[in-house]
Amino acid sequence: SDALSSIKFNVFDNQKFTMKELIDAMNDDFKGHEDILNLVKNKTPKYGNDDDYADDIMVSVFNEYKDYITGRPTTRGGVYHVDMLPTTCHVYFGDVMIASPNGRLAHIPLSEGISPEKGADINGPTAVVKSCSKMNHCETGGTLLNQKFTPAAIAGEKGIDNLAALIRSYFAMNGHHMQFNVIDRQTLIE
């Protein structure tokens, strides 16, 4: 939904650049178009920040997708039901795509499930769960929200209490599924 948010915000609502200029920038992987890249990455509403501008677009896209897929017949006599559990297909799809209107460069993975685009969630984990809870999780076969923390972020009793409060809040807002990766940069490098 960040790609659509970028188009709506920058091309239509604020006329920061034209659609042709955006497409040219995407085709060039934003090389030579750093001004556009800066606008779409840093000055555009993004999903995962509890920003209704971006979150309303996510809800609208989800509802259109759900309404189109759910109930359609399968080739074996069943019906389709939408889910938001991509496992690893976000990596493949990102790898075969050009750059996106939100500043994701070519060949970079897409977001995971209902997780915000990597680096887009700048207002913290509470804002992420508030954004995610705006969709109706009960209308899916499942959703996937990945949250990443450094070990220091959840260290000690206070850290564990904060994590527990985040989980409780998400489920109180009718969130469905959340999983965590707790690892530091050095461990990933090793």
Spans of model-derived segments:
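Acidic, glycine-enriched catalytic cores built around paired aspartates
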Residues: 1-190
